[in-house]
C-alpha cells in the first residue's frame, strides 16, 4: 500500500535536500547541488541527457542539455485549486526573474524542473497539472513585454519546463 508523506512538515532546507536526492537518484552523479544561501534560483543543475520515459528509451520525451532543478515547497497545503494558484504564481515569478534585465541568475537553462509538494488535480485540461503545464508552455514562447515580439524565453534558449508534483514526489520517496 502506498504511503503519503507529509512533505509540508519538512523544513525548507530538508525539502531542498530531498529535491537534490531525487535528482541524484533519477539523473545520476552528474548532478551539481548547491548549498544553503543564495543559489541563483537553483537547488541543483545537471548537463546531459534526461529520459523521462523508462519504457521508451531516448526519444520524444527526452531532454539533452543544461537542466536547472528548483524546489517549491508549500508550507500549508490547501485544496488542489489553491495549490495550483500558489504554484502558478511561484513559477511565474521564477520566469520573471530569469527574464529581468538585472537578473543575477547567470546561465539560462535549456530545461527547468520544478519539484513541489503541492498536490494538484489531474482532471484533464482543467486540473492543476494541466494548468501548470499549459502555463509553462505559454510563458516559454510568449514575447517578453516591451520587446519587439522576437524576444522570449524560448528565443533565449529555454526549451521546456516540467513539474514534479506532490503526488509524484511522494511516490518517488
Task: Please report, for each region that a protein language model flagged, where it lies by residue.
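Mixed-charge (Asp/Glu-Lys/Arg
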Residues: 1-173
Amino acid at each position: 500500500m502506498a504511503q503519503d508523506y507529509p512533505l509540508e512538515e519538512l523544513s525548507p532546507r530538508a525539502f531542498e535536500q530531498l529535491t537534490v536526492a531525487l535528482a541524484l537518484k533519477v539523473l545520476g552523479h552528474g548532478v551539481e547541488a548547491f548549498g544553503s544561501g543564495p543559489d541563483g534560483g537553483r537547488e541543483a543543475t545537471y548537463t546531459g541527457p534526461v529520459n523521462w520515459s523508462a519504457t521508451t528509451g531516448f526519444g520524444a520525451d527526452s531532454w539533452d542539455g543544461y537542466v536547472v532543478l528548483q524546489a517549491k515547497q508549500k508550507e500549508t497545503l490547501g485544496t488542489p485549486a489553491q495549490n495550483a494558484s500558489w504554484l502558478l504564481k511561484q513559477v511565474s515569478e521564477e520566469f520573471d526573474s530569469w527574464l529581468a534585465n538585472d537578473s543575477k541568475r547567470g546561465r539560462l537553462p535549456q530545461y527547468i524542473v520544478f519539484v513541489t509538494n503541492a498536490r494538484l488535480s489531474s482532471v484533464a485540461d482543467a486540473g492543476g497539472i494541466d494548468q501548470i503545464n499549459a502555463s509553462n508552455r505559454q510563458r516559454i514562447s510568449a514575447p517578453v513585454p516591451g520587446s519587439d515580439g522576437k524576444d522570449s524565453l524560448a528565443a533565449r534558449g529555454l526549451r521546456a519546463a516540467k513539474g514534479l508534483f506532490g503526488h509524484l514526489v511522494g511516490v518517488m520517496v
